[in-house]
Amino acid sequence: MNHFWSDRIQSIGTLDSSRKLRFSDRFQNAYTELFRLEEGARILEIGCGTGALCRALKRWYPSAEVVGLDRDDAFIDYARERNTGETYRKGDATALPFADGSFDVTISNTVSEHVEPSGFFGEQRRVLRDGGVCLLLSARRGIQHPAACVREESAFEMEIWERVDADFRRAAKENGVGAYALNEMELPAAMEKYGFRDVETHYLAINLTPDDPFYTPEEARDMINANRQNDLDNIERMESVAPGAVSKADRDRLVRLVNERYDRRLALYEAGEKQWDVTLGLTMLLRGVK
């Protein structure tokens, strides 16, 4: 069983909560205007994680056949339990378990930077029909300003994170995290190099600002709690990334401190005391044709 990514790189809770926000129906038109997909298409998501994008695709294209693929068993199990009509399979992005020309669309989100380009693009081109569409979403440097009540860290917390920092970096390096990252010029050139034509580049800004009245109270709380989930999952991963480096008592104390801070942030939101903390995700979207 392969749980390496979900255990040591990005936990289920963090991945699912962040992707559900980014692929909320609130942003549907922004995505679909650039995707330009036909109803009834057979769509393969490579590196589907917990299935948040697959579920969004099924909502946005109800007659589509949506298939999600990931190498992490925990992600696939989670996605299968929550499927809304999609199919999920375990597999490798560089050895897709599908016949030539079997999909109309391939799509990936924050995957290309972790996979060797010739295999990544070559396999997608193989499983696409002639005229099929390859969509690639890649996170670019965005903006993040946490609320002051969340940003505060005690000396106790700073010492522990300094203690395990090298272990987290090593885990990322050992699993090839970001090993094949390409810049905004190199990505479209790579797509062309490996056989795609009519390559387009677009950029989407996803603004997650809880205090913006554009969002409902439920959405605002989800934004705050997604950041909480990320911080809590980082603590939970400590034991698998740096075994024995931090005692359970100290990990429990870290959890209490994180929850206290985010509880304060939620209380400020409920009281109408705006903090204007923001996470703005910038996504580069590429579209190419076989």
Regions found by a protein language model. Give the residues of each.
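Conserved alpha-helix/loop element of class I SAM-dependent methyltransferases that forms part
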Residues: 22-39
